[in-house]
Structures are given as C-alpha cells and as structure tokens.
Design a protein with these regions (language model features):
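Ser/Thr-rich, Pro/Gly/Ala-heavy low-complexity intrinsically disordered linkers and tails
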Residues: 1-3, 7-63, 392-393
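Glycine-centered flexibility sites
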Residues: 39, 49-52, 140, 341, ...
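Sequence context surrounding c-type heme c attachment/ligation sites in exported
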Residues: 57-70, 134, 153-326, 330-393
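Conserved small-residue
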Residues: 61-131, 137-139, 144-151, 157-188
Length: 393
C-alpha cells in the first residue's frame, strides 16, 4: 500500500478531523506493538506538575472530544496522538504541562533526522535510579520521540512520533505517523512499518525492529541513563530531575566517561549507538552472543582499558557468526573488532560504513552512513598508541 493511502485509510478508520499546523522542531527510526498488556490512553499528570517542555509555557491536557480516543481492538494505546497526553493544545503544538523536553548528551544516529524527545512521569511518582546502569520507571511513565525529516523542496516536515508507555503489565509502544499535511498523527497498525515515508527516505520501523532494540535495556528505555543525562545533555539533567522531584538523589549519577577528548567521544558514541540497545551482556540483547560489548557501566569508568568496549574489542577476533558480505576484504583473517592504530582492519569501522548488507551497523533504522560517527571512532583507533596493547598480527 502506498504511504499516502495507508495513512489516509488510518485517518478515515479513526474518524479523525483536520486541524492544526506543523510543529517547529528544535532538535537534529514501533509500530503498534505491545509488551505485556495494560489500559488505554489514560491522561498522565506529568512530572510533579512541572511546567511544559524546556520550561516553556504549557497548557493542561484534556482528552479531546472531537476524535475517537479508544484503543484499537488488538492494542492498548489510542489511535490518535492527540489522546496520549503530549499536547495541551494540539492545534498550536503546545506541549502539555508536566511533559518535559530533553536531549541526551549523545544522540542515536537516525540518518540525520531532527528529533525532539519528551517524558512524563506520573505526579507523585519517582524514577528509581539507585542502580545508575538500570533506571526503573513507575507505572504510567511515557516517553515520546518526534522525528522531522527533509521533505519536498528541502523543507523540514514531521514524519512520526514514537511513544513508550509503562503499564502494570509492562511496556507498550507504537509509532504515530503524521499525515502528508502534518495535521494529524495516527498510530501505525500494521506489522510491516513504512519504507520511504512520503518519498523522504525515512523508514518507520516494524514492531519486531522496535522490540529488538529496546529489549536490550533492563527497563526498556534507551537514551536516559546517568551518562546521557550528564555532561552535554540539554533540557534535563540529573540535578534538575532532583529539583523537579522526578528522582530522589543524584549523588550516584555524577559519572564521567574516562580518557582524553578523543576517547570520551568514541566511547560515548559507541555506548549510545551500539551498547545501550544491542551490544551488552544482557541475555535479551540482540548482539549478546557476539561477545562484543560496547555499553559503559558505572563500575568500569575509572580508565579506558577497564571499559567493556576496550576489553571485548581491542585485538579481539570477531565472533564466529560475524557477517563479512559487502566488505572490500571478506576474509575473516583480515579482521579484528578493533586493531589498535589501524581502522582499515577494524571490523567496528567497516560495519559503520557498510549499508545494504546484513552486517551493517547499526543493523536497523539507518540507510545512510554517519560520517561524523565514523570519524570519531576511526580517530580513537588511529590514536591508540603507548597506553594500548600493540596491534595483533
């Protein structure tokens, strides 16, 4: 089904009316899927009754009466984005009171899409941050991520808004696809996602792809941890969350990535883009069986060589199930996950620049190479000198 026809059919099925103009993104790819079960689109109170996104003016959320806010028969989230509690005034794209906007210290690569992120914690509830590596969220927590991409004529347009909500039975998640005129955002209700949305090249992931990334995190949320709320974060920090009453104590969250600037940039990039979701030691993580772990843990931040990224990658041969199709040299004997001083024989870099093959990294959600990310990781490997092991043969 063509993208326009698909979204049009969803709009018609939802009984939705038109109205409102496009949002103005301030930043830079689940569809109808559920984990467990839970209630429908209930209103949330927000983080302790705090103001709107980024401290801006806000409007109180009220369940709209001009659209059907019921969840589809096979789901628990409402069909229309307006019913989720993100906007106090949808027509003006005014964020609801208690919804907080944030930007993590390191952003996940999404083919250059501009993103805005929002969170709502139920009033009177707190996030358990006693384990800085694994935050636990209260029931009713909601995270939204809005994607804007380059459309016809080079102008930015809204593509999708993803939602994660924690229910009594677990996390539920979906993606709301914006109509071509950007006046409505309706929940994806197929199992396939959308490829090349409105000719922009943007892909809305299918439900399996959403789960593949998020199950690699203890409580499902990516991009919200001690490091991502630390140096470089915008909108929210651990300290501001204490002030808002969202967390009780930030004393164990003052973590710093080890090393010089080059090392910190590379380790932070690999943590956010590879380690948080897939390359970590959680049994559910998609790349757990590779033995290549790139997530930064609080207990290993004393020095670079103590990190999983260094211990499991430097001078390590790739896993037996590694994919080499599409590489200029497909001989496994040529490769190390990281070969100090030699990005050209480091499979980590080769996968970063690979696209269109199973071995590309990130494996899903991207069709374009992150040139900046490649440069960051390559420079780290190139500068591995005195304090690093000598390169393997």
């Amino acid at each position: 089904m063509r993208n326009g026809s698909l979204v049009g059919a969803l709009l018609l099925a939802a009984g939705c009316s038109s109205g409102g103009g496009p949002a103005q993104p301030e930043g830079e790819g689940g569809s109808g899927a559920t984990v467990g079960s839970g209630g429908s689109g209930a209103q949330t109170s927000g983080a302790g009754g705090a103001g709107g996104a980024g401290g801006a003016s806000c409007a109180e959320f009220a369940m709209p009466t001009d659209v059907d806010c019921a969840a589809p028969l096979d789901g628990v989230l409402p069909v229309d984005l307006r019913c989720t509690g993100l906007y106090g005034n949808f027509d003006q794209r005014e964020i609801a009171c208690g919804v907080l906007e944030y930007k993590p210290a390191v952003e996940l690569w999404s083919d250059g899409a501009k993103k805005r992120r929002f969170v709502s914690i139920p009033k009177g509830q707190q996030v358990d941050t006693s384990n800085p590596d694994a935050f636990i969220y209260p029931e009713g927590t909601q995270f939204w991520k809005e994607f804007s991409v380059t459309g016809a004529g080079g102008a930015q347009r809204l593509a999708e808004t993803r939602l994660l909500r924690k229910t009594a039975a677990g996390w539920v998640y979906t993606s709301y696809v914006w109509s071509e005129d950007e006046k409505q955002a309706i929940q994806m209700q197929n199992d396939f996602g959308v490829t090349d949305l409105y000719g922009t090249g943007h892909t809305v992931p299918n439900r399996d792809q959403c789960q593949e990334c998020h199950v690699g995190r203890a409580d499902y949320v990516l991009g919200w941890d001690a490091l991502m709320l630390g140096s470089g974060a915008q909108g929210l920090s651990a300290e501001t969350l204490v002030e808002l009453g969202v967390i009780a104590d930030a004393s164990n969250l003052a973590l710093t990535i080890p090393g010089n600037e080059v090392e910190r940039q590379a380790l932070g990039y690999l943590h956010a883009n590879c380690g948080v979701s897939c390359h970590n030691d959680l049994p559910e993580a998609a790349a757990h069986d590779t033995g290549l772990y790139l997530r930064l843990e609080a207990s290993e931040l004393g020095e670079v060589m103590a990190t999983d990224a260094a211990r499991t990658a430097i001078n390590k041969r790739p896993a037996e199930n590694a994919k080499y199709e599409g590489l200029t040299n497909p001989d496994p004997a040529n490769w190390y996950d990281i070969r100090p001083g030699d990005p050209s024989r480091s499979l980590l870099v080769a996968r970063q620049v690979l696209r269109g093959f199973e071995g590309q990294m990130p494996r899903i959600g991207t069709h374009k190479v992150d040139e900046t990310g490649v440069e960051v990781v390559s420079r780290w490997i190139q500068e591995m000198k005195e304090t690093y092991p000598p390169p393997g043969p």
